[in-house]
Amino acid sequence: MDAIKKKMQAMKLEKDNALDRAAMCEQQAKDANLRAEKAEEEARQLQKKIQTIENELDQTQESLMQVNGKLEEKEKALQNAESEVAALNRRIQLLEEDLERSEERLATATAKLSEASQAADESERARKVLENRSLADEERMDALENQLKEARFLAEEADKKYDEVARKLAMVEADLERAEERAESGESKIVELEEELRVVGNNLKSLEVSEEKANQREEEYKNQIKTLTTRLKEAEARAEFAERSVQKLQKEVDRLEDELVAEKEKYKDIGDDLDTAFVELILKE
């Protein structure tokens, strides 16, 4: 009887211990499940961060493509501007050559005008000499009448020549005015071309500044892509570590659940043994 009681007490103690171990296993299983859920939540958050970083990387790459497109457009604009500058230089050279020819024609016209003026002066002096002689030689008027007529004829011829010279002079002056107008027009055109050249130069400077800024932005985008790539690799590494941690925790949960099942089976066996012992005790009494 004492042996049975001791056995029952031992079995009860073992049952209590089994219950404690089962409770502890259940608590450990709950803790492991909480850790697993937390790890899964962290893994989901990391996955979201990875997705966000990938989206940022895509946007950055798209921005880089846009910047490269703009750079190509600016390079084309720069080439067009250089072509325009070359064309303007050719036009300026042609205008300079035209101006030189105009100056040569102007110099020729000026020389002809000077010669015509000298001829007109000489004719005027000859006419005055003839008139002075006719007035001074009144006593010899009869004798010199024929000479006077001839002098008048010469004077008329001189007048005709003077009129012809004056007409030619007017024509030369008109040619000179046209040459001056062309020279002024050429100078105005040169000023306009110089202004266009200055504007093109400013545009080239602006394009160079824009290109430098675009290069800086491209370098910044490259650095940003490099940083995002590093962050993506780190996030992937953390995600892999979290997945491994979840797998380890899941294995730990499975192990604790197996231990819990084993403890429950053991508890059931102890319960069966106690029931058998009670039955035997009752039968002996």
Curated annotation (Swiss-Prot):
Keyword RNA-binding: no
Keyword annotations from UniProtKB, A to Z: Coiled coil, Repeat
Origin superkingdom: Eukaryota
Chain residue ranges for the region called Disordered: 103-133
PROSITE patterns assigned to the protein according to its UniProt record, in alphabetical order: TROPOMYOSIN
InterPro entries membership: Tropomyosin (IPR000533)
Pfam families linked: Tropomyosin (PF00261)
Comp. bias (Basic and acidic residues): 122-133
Protein known as: Tropomyosin-2
Annotated source species: Bombyx mori
